């Protein structure tokens, strides 16, 4: 254990044999009904890792049936003490911690994450999130209500039922924990669809679900494509809730499918273009580093990236200079290699989309300060890119890039920057850097975002709720608010012969 409290960084595993490639339904491994499989690739080498069974509508039906049976009244899961549910989630967290090295290595191979980041950050958050949710299992309580008349009234927080959980490829272990932790601690059963690009860690966790002792059907994991498996979950008449993290475009489709089917409950965490505002009185060293990490962590593949950076005019030139110097310090290569701190984008499609947006920045008049091109002959690498002289009407200032591209815009006044920062369809997170407390309070109150970080960035924790305003989605994940997204409140009122205070 290091002095910072983080575990020491071991070497990644070598020559991993992929053990789990089938669908996990009812605590058993299944081939797909259609017999189809799909390839999974290493984005650093472009090599195929393995083939994984491809879930389709028929497989989703099987998973939903198993989940529904596990949720029936009188089932082992429904009759289990809440404290025991919590113990199962604690056990799962312990098993993930036991297999932390394997999971971090898989995450690096399959998702292109720098190994140190996967091991120290992603797996750390995953384990903490599950333990946080485990602690909530026997603390979800209703209330007694002093209603008028000779009645006794109280509320129950009941599990919603069968929940479909769909998440993307950029942080598979974090997103898995943020979905299954709250759902399971409240007593729901789940159908998990990991991204087709990165299913391997979720499938390993499936084996740990069984090892931990969860009853059959409580957790089902069905890798597949969005238009087939994802659509089947979203439109299924026997799924009671769907929680989705991904693009706004797909989020709209999921909400529409939910409405047109059984009006299932929906939680959405969608796209973003997050403002990060640096005032002239900020600690410049700290602001440069936080803003830098905010956009370049995980090669910019983050919904909470600091992708719309506003810097006050008086410090603009120095801020740009320091940001460029910082962006030039990366070491590229296979993310499993010691010393490498910049990995690939997830696939060719994402790589090409990012490069197209970089080219748009050049054509629309932004000044390319560094980067701006691909790197290497193999893998989907893009150089960390910094643009200055960016204006609000440019595509790189308006569109979610989801890549290692920092665009730095200039502002003159507080009122101006608040208006510009809010001039977006999105509202997920924001950052503010200033030593002036009044300014910090004013700006954080005015920004239309679900999370505002002051003099920090990427300071996410399992104890705090996360979610978006506007087209960044609705509902919250993690924290107490995120737990209650997975319950229905029932009021029970009974007639009594006499009521006394």
UniProtKB/Swiss-Prot annotation:
UniProtKB keywords = Cytoplasm, NAD, Oxidoreductase
Could you tell me where this protein is found in the cell? Cytoplasm
Give EC number(s), comma-separated: 1.2.1.3
One MF term in the entry's GO annotations: NAD binding
Protein name as catalogued: Aldehyde dehydrogenase, cytosolic 1
The pathway to which it is assigned is: Alcohol metabolism; ethanol degradation; acetate from ethanol: step 2/2
Q: Name one GO biological process term.
A: retinal metabolic process
According to UniProt, where does the site described as Transition state stabilizer lie? 170
Family stated for the protein in its record: Belongs to the aldehyde dehydrogenase family.
Q: In which residues is NAD(+) bound?
A: 246-251
A cellular component annotation (GO) from this entry: cytoplasm
PROSITE patterns according to UniProt? ALDEHYDE_DEHYDR_CYS (PS00070)
Which reactions is this enzyme annotated as catalysing? Answer: an aldehyde + NAD(+) + H2O = a carboxylate + NADH + 2 H(+)
**Which Pfam families does UniProt cross-reference here?**
Aldedh
Which PANTHER family would you find in this protein's record? ALDEHYDE DEHYDROGENASE-RELATED
> Gene that codes for this?
ALDH1
């Amino acid at each position: 254990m290091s002095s910072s409290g983080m575990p020491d960084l071991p070497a990644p595993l070598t020559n991993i044999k992929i053990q789990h490639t089938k669908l996990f339904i009812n605590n058993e491994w299944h081939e797909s009904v259609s017999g189809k499989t799909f390839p999974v690739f290493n984005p650093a080498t472009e090599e195929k890792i393995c083939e994984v069974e491809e879930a389709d509508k028929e497989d989703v039906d099987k998973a939903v049936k198993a989940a529904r049976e596990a949720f029936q009244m009188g089932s082992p899961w429904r009759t289990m003490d809440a404290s025991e549910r919590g113990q199962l989630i604690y056990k799962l967290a312990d098993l993930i911690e036991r297999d932390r090295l394997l999971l971090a290595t898989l995450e690096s191979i399959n998702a292109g994450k720098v190994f140190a980041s996967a091991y120290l950050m992603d797996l750390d958050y995953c384990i903490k999130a599950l333990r946080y949710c485990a602690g909530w299992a026997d603390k979800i309580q209703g209330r007694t209500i002093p209603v008028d008349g000779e009645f006794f009234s109280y509320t129950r927080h009941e599990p919603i039922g069968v929940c479909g959980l769909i998440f993307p490829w950029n942080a598979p272990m974090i997103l898995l924990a943020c979905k299954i932790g709250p759902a399971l601690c409240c007593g729901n059963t789940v159908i998990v669809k990991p991204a087709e690009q990165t299913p391997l860690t979720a499938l390993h966790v499936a084996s740990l679900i069984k090892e931990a002792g969860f009853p059959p059907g409580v957790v089902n994991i069905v890798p597949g494509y969005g238009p087939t498996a994802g659509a089947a979950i979203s439109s299924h008449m026997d799924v009671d809730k769907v929680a989705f993290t991904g693009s706004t475009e797909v989020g709209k489709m999921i909400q529409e499918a939910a409405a047109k089917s059984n009006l299932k409950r929906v939680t959405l965490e969608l796209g973003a273009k997050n403002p990060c505002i640096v005032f002239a009185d900020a600690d410049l060293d700290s602001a440069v580093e936080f803003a830098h990490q905010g956009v370049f962590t995980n090669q910019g593949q983050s919904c909470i990236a600091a992708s719309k950076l506003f810097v006050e005019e008086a410090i603009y030139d120095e801020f740009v200079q320091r940001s460029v110097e910082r962006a030039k310090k990366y070491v590229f290569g296979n993310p499993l290699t010691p010393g490498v701190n910049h990995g690939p984008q997830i696939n060719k499609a994402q790589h090409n989309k990012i490069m197209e947006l970089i080219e748009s920045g050049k054509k629309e008049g932004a000044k390319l300060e560094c980067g701006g091109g691909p790197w290497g002959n193999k893998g989907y690498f893009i150089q960390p890119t910094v643009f200055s002289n960016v204006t609000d009407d440019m595509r790189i200032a308006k569109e979610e890039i989801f890549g290692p591209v920092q665009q730095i815009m200039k502002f003159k006044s507080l009122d101006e920057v608040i208006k510009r920062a809010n001039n977006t369809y999105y509202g997920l997170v924001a950052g503010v850097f200033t030593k002036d407390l009044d300014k910090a309070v004013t700006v954080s109150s005015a920004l239309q975002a679900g999370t505002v970080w002051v003099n920090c960035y990427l300071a996410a924790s399992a104890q705090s709720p996360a979610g978006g305003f506007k087209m960044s989605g609705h509902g919250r994940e993690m924290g107490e608010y995120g737990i209650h997204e997975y319950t229905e409140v029932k009021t029970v009122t009974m007639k009594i012969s006499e009521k006394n205070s």
